[in-house]
Amino acid sequence: MHLDLISITWGCLMATFTASLALVIWARNGL
């Protein structure tokens, strides 16, 4: 149960990082 919580938290962190990184790249290409 505890390991699942860590996995979910890490997954959300990576998803947020990937989304923000993609947004920055998209914004630069847009400009």
UniProtKB/Swiss-Prot annotation:
Belongs to the PetN family. Signal peptide: none annotated. It comes from the Eukaryota. The 4 large subunits of the cytochrome b6-f complex are cytochrome b6, subunit IV (17 kDa polypeptide, PetD), cytochrome f and the Rieske protein, while the 4 small subunits are PetG, PetL, PetM and PetN. The complex functions as a dimer. GO terms for biological process: cytochrome complex assembly; photosynthesis. It comes from Cyanidioschyzon merolae (strain NIES-3377 / 10D) (Unicellular red alga). InterPro entries: Cytochr_b6-f_cplx_su8_sf (IPR036143), Cytochrome_b6-f_cplx_su8 (IPR005497). The chain crosses the membrane at residues 5-25. One of its GO terms (molecular function) is electron transporter, transferring electrons within cytochrome b6/f complex of photosystem II activity. Keywords: Chloroplast, Electron transport, Membrane, Photosynthesis, Plastid, Thylakoid, Transmembrane, Transmembrane helix, Transport. The gene is petN. This is Cytochrome b6-f complex subunit 8.
